[in-house]
């Protein structure tokens, strides 16, 4: 699905709202909606190969789409132990921030870092939007929430102000996200599922 497909749906669904003639503003709102879905659901899990040397302990993921560093694996697919306790003695690495980590005992070799990826920045109507079709309604509700958030004097047929319409669309968005979670779209990021990705089955 392309940005233009969503633009067409937006202009149809919100025909009674004074939308900007220029698509740029709407594309920015579409991107915010896609980003929110990526934040709520694990729509893109990627890996980056890290070359380790003994004289360097601090490493940073270089890929531009890193949203959140998740875990670290050796070349056999074994998950390294993360320190989640202050002053812990037994640990392989500690997370510094969303894209950096420190190794306890760095050795020559390769490690594989798994991370949650951000969506591509949408700039053009021809750009592809990588979300399941089942999430389109949720995306449109988020767009409706954002559109009505910017409307200060709009009054709908039933008398609601723009702010009330905004709240209504956001509640619909949350409800649809809960439905998607119940349908199995929110896959937990546990060690077993991540190790399968590392070994190349996904």
Language model features: what each stretch is:
Residues 47-61:
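Solvent-exposed, conformationally flexible loop/turn segments
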Residues 32-49:
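Generic amphipathic, hydrophobic interface segment in small proteins and small subunits
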Residues 79-88:
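Short amphipathic beta-strand/extended segments with alternating polar/hydrophobic composition
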Residues 62-79:
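Solvent-exposed beta-hairpin/edge-strand motifs
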Residues 22-29, 54:
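Short, conserved alpha-helical segments within structured domains
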Residues 12-24, 36, 40:
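Subunit-assembly interface segments of extracellular/virion macromolecular structures
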Residues 1-9, 28, 32-35, 90-202:
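Internal mixed-charge
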């Amino acid at each position: 699905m392309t940005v233009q497909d969503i633009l067409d749906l937006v202009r149809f669904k919100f025909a009674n709202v004074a939308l900007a003639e220029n698509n740029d503003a709407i594309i920015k709102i579409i991107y915010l909606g896609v980003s929110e879905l990526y934040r709520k659901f694990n729509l893109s899990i990627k890996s980056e190969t890290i070359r380790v040397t003994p004289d360097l302990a601090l490493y940073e993921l270089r890929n531009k789409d890193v949203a959140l560093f998740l875990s670290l694996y050796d070349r056999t697919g074994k998950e390294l132990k993360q320190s989640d306790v202050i002053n812990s003695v037994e640990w392989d690495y500690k997370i510094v921030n969303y894209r950096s980590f420190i190794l306890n005992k760095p050795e020559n070799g390769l490690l594989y870092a798994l991370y949650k990826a951000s969506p591509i920045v949408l700039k053009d109507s021809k750009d592809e939007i990588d979300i399941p079709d089942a999430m389109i309604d949720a995306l449109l509700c988020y767009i409706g929430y954002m559109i009505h958030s910017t409307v200060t004097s709009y009054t709908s047929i039933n008398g609601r102000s723009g702010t009330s319409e905004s709240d209504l669309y956001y509640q619909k968005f949350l409800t649809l996200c809960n439905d998607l979670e119940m349908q199995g779209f929110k896959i937990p990021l546990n060690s077993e599922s991540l190790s399968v990705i590392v070994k190349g089955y996904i």
